Amino acid sequence: MRKEAIYHRPADNFAYAYDSETLHLRLRTKKDDIDRVELLHGDPYDWQNGAWQFQMMPMRKTGSDELFDYWFAEVKPPYRRLRYGFVLYSGEEKLVYTEKGFYFEVPTDDTAYYFCFPFLHRVDLFEAPDWVKDTVWYQIFPERFANGNPSISPEGSRPWGSEDPTPTSFFGGDLQGIIDHLDYLVDLGITGIYLTPIFRSPSNHKYDTADYFEVDPHFGDKETLKTLIDRCHEKGIRVMLDAVFNHCGYEFAPFQDVWKNGESSKYKDWFHIHEFPLQTEPRPNYDTFRFVPQMPKLNTANPEVKRYLLDVATYWIREFDIDGWRLDVANEIDHEFWREFRQEVKALKPDVYILGEIWHDAMPWLRGDQFDAVMNYPFTDGVLRFFAKEEISARQFANQMMHVLHSYPNNVNEAAFNLLGSHDTSRILTVCGGDIRKVKLLFLFQLTFTGSPCIYYGDEIGMTGGNDPECRKCMVWDPMQQNKELHQHVKQLIALRKQYRSLRRGEISFLHADDEMNYLIYKKTDGDETVLVIINRSDQKADIPIPLDARGTWLVNLLTGERFAAEAETLCTSLPPYGFVLYAIEHW
């Protein structure tokens, strides 16, 4: 056994409370090194005749990445506390792995050998809103979705879709335009809208906030926003707003006061200022987002700033009943601020969704005291590299997805915000080189994966564009310019996701990933319900054997409704280039 690859720690993604009664435990071992693992566990105070009393249970291998295998066990400690270790088997070799190291036999004279989960406290639970697990999100960049009220469009706005956008161009998109097209979203199957910032700002993107308590007048007013949210709720759609608390805009009144009054300004400590007077060249002498002078960084450790921003967060929940906050540049704000943020917004609306924009490993923010989820860019990276760019093989892709899933606890994965693209990335059809078949595979995997999927406006009809600002083109409303086949594909997948709980909440298992032909087989399982997904990510027809003994069941093609009895031990399906199929497995 390769001892140096064996790893566990009683915290985070390796040991966590799944609910108020259940503990999840994981173990990492070298890939293909261990035959089986047993969990050794017991109450730390359960002793008889000088020996600690423990039980043994098998652990289940839940997946592998490029280097490691991952093992899993679920325990319900009767007294909500646990001491535990692992017994590993490889051929004739046996090792006991504990917090103090490795042993050949199980130590029973002292529980101090073992890993400890001291007590399962409900207050320590990671609990994301349950509704998020069933939500299909739709991200809207308000300035480019629809112009419902031309009378409030900014001066110099261009005719809708008349030209490609620039960083400073306006086309007049607004909140009324979103209201006017809610039926389109309902028909698609959308149950959550994520709006990029809507607060007063001089830019088209609104990430340089001037007033956090006012709707930008070119988007509408508070009454229009209230109407939008009420209409959404009537139609079963949740609404999430975007908060920019890392930095403000140049026109934010406190920053203007500092710019005018310098060191004598009462707001000077609201920002991270290195010296006075303020200057922007060659670089700002105050902290900013990136090095953008128009986006000064807020000092969230300052009690006045903290109170101001927390009041902003609670105001829009209390007065407008929003359902979530997406938090921009969340990783550059101190953890203490986010802990207080969570306490205040959850006290007001316990099932509000808190989503952080973090592009890297975000475990420090996902321990139950800060965020409910982060934007799952590691997922995005993997699916684009496999389906769109064809940079990695099927096995490498399966490994990467398993690494993503094992980086976080299961209850974190269930609420993860899974996106294919956004206002910060190139359009997926552009990344796919214009190949709609690849885009279909992207949506198929996204809408059958664990977590909460988000569609960037227009991707479902085949809009194109490179990085910002090209990815922020006006929504195409002319039916003749929309890809109806792609739209129908997305609509059908969303409907299937709603119909089959396993597609929303089931555990994913990769059954086979073929590097030679680049096909992928995985299943989603929830209780007795199983859906099998088979994908051919190659430009050649593939005859694919199904590594699943399904004898005694019906295989129902969810795309066509056809069904056939699985009577043979080995089944096979034939798929065209970039083809796919979904089977529900139903018992006779």
From Swiss-Prot:
The record lists the catalysed reaction(s) as:
Hydrolysis of pullulan to panose (6-alpha-D-glucosylmaltose)
The record's cofactor note says: Binds 1 Ca(2+) ion per subunit.
Which residues bind Ca(2+) per the record? Answer: 147, 149, 153, 172, 174
Query: Active site at which residues?
Result: 328, 357
Arranged from A to Z, the UniProt key words for this protein are: Calcium, Glycosidase, Hydrolase, Metal-binding
The keyword Hydrolase is assigned to this record: yes
A Gene Ontology BP annotation from the UniProt entry: carbohydrate metabolic process
State the signal peptide span: none
Keyword Hydrolase included in the entry's annotation? yes
Site Transition state stabilizer: list residues.
424
Q: Which SMART domains match?
A: Aamy
**What SUPFAM superfamilies would the database entry show?**
(Trans)glycosidases, Glycosyl hydrolase domain
* Gene3D superfamilies according to UniProt: Glycosidases (3.20.20.80), Golgi alpha-mannosidase II (2.60.40.1180), Immunoglobulins (2.60.40.10), Oligo-1,6-glucosidase, Domain 2 (3.90.400.10)
Q: Which GO terms describe its molecular function?
A: calcium ion binding; D-glucose binding; identical protein binding; neopullulanase activity; protein homodimerization activity
Cofactor(s) this protein cannot do without: Ca(2+)
**Where is substrate annotated to bind?**
247, 326, 423-424, 468, 472
Record-stated family: Belongs to the glycosyl hydrolase 13 family.
Q: What does this protein do?
A: Hydrolyzes pullulan efficiently but only a small amount of starch. Endohydrolysis of 1,4-alpha-glucosidic linkages in pullulan to form panose. Also cleaves (1-6)-alpha-glucosidic linkages to form maltotriose.
Write down what this protein is called: Neopullulanase
Native organism is Geobacillus stearothermophilus (Bacillus stearothermophilus)
Gene from which this protein is expressed:
nplT
